[in-house]
Amino acid sequence: MHEAPRGFLEGEALRPRPFRAGLGHLGWIFAGGALGAAARLAVEGAARRLAPAAYEAFPWGTLAANAAGSFLIAIFGTLIFERFVGERARAFWVLGFLGSLTTFSSYALHTLRGWEASPLLGGLYGGGSLLLGLLAALAGLRLTRRLL
């Protein structure tokens, strides 16, 4: 079993290697970004189709995309920080795909709009998104370490 360092950046395992992106990496970032944006659109569409009334009352699609992105970023973050992952994979998956799939700006907007409609609803969404994102990231981290 992998033992995580005690401090946030204590130990070599959690110190990110510098990303040496160059112009050659832009294509990988663009390609990952296009797929991440398409995945985001698919998640939003699925949320709307599965529960149209609930979708109008609560931003389920953003919540689902951010939770999935938190899970996946923990997997790729663990691979990047604890094992070697090439610069192209890092550019494609982390900067491109996950950067397009998850959006903090949408989270902030939905939280504020929910708060304006109902402080309880806005608080539940804002707090729930944060908690779900952290739990998803923890699950991704633990799963990846278990598999490594």
Curated annotation (Swiss-Prot):
The gene is fluC2. Na(+) is not transported, but it plays an essential structural role and its presence is essential for fluoride channel function. One of its GO terms (biological process) is cellular detoxification of fluoride. It catalyses: fluoride(in) = fluoride(out). This is Fluoride-specific ion channel FluC 2. The lineage of its organism: Bacteria, Bacillati, Actinomycetota, Rubrobacteria, Rubrobacterales. Pfam families: CRCB. Belongs to the fluoride channel Fluc/FEX (TC 1.A.43) family. Na(+) binds at G99, T102. It is a multi-pass membrane protein. Keywords: Cell membrane, Ion channel, Ion transport, Membrane, Metal-binding, Sodium, Transmembrane, Transmembrane helix, Transport. Its main location: membrane.
